[in-house]
């Protein structure tokens, strides 16, 4: 079988798998909000995400199976903050690097990421993609990548 990756925008029908990933123990440890999320809260979040013109959530599919998400939040005209989640069963398989590479390949501007300093897999991945550390504050590393 040929390996096929597809990065697409999230739809309302993706809510269940996204909630499973969001409430995963390791995802919550690495998130800035580590609270469990209810079905009602999550469905409302997805609905608001889809209608927010300054926020877009993408899902990466591998052979049509959802394996990760990347969210962009527009801060300025050419500046986006990125955050991402990998399916628990696909962690450690370079999915994050593939997903970020597919996302960044045809984009221009400044891209920011905030990563907890203890999240070494994420730090290693974004540094490999060329993100540079520009600030540290309260155990959070701030990274930036400029693409022109």
Residue ranges of each PLM-predicted region?
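Juxtamembrane/interface motifs at transmembrane-helix termini
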Residues: 37-41, 49-51, 89
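Structural motif
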Residues: 25-26, 53
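A short helix-loop-beta-strand connector motif used in the catalytic cores of GNAT acetyltransferases and
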Residues: 47-59
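Acyl-donor (CoA/ACP) binding surface of acyl/acetyltransferases
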Residues: 1-17, 21, 57, 61-148
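Conserved GNAT-fold acetyl-CoA-binding loop/helix
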Residues: 26-45
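Hydrophobic residues in alpha-helical segments
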Residues: 22, 31, 49-50
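An amphipathic alpha-helix signature
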Residues: 12-19, 39, 43, 47
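Alpha-helix boundary/capping detector
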Residues: 44-48, 69-72
């Amino acid at each position: 079988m040929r390996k096929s990756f597809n990065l697409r925008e999230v739809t309302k029908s993706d809510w269940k798998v996204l909630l499973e990933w969001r409430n995963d123990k390791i995802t919550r440890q690495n998130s800035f909000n580590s609270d469990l999320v209810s079905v009602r809260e999550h469905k409302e979040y997805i609905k608001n995400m889809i209608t927010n013109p300054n926020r877009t959530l993408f899902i990466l599919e591998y052979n049509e199976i959802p394996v990760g998400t990347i969210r962009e939040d527009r801060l300025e005209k050419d500046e986006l903050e990125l955050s991402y989640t990998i399916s628990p069963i696909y962690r450690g398989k370079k999915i994050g690097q593939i997903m970020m590479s597919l996302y960044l390949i045809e984009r221009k501007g400044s891209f920011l990421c905030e990563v907890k300093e203890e999240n070494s897999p994420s730090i290693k991945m974004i540094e490999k993609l060329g993100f540079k550390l520009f600030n540290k504050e309260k155990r959070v590393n701030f990274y930036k990548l400029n693409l022109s």
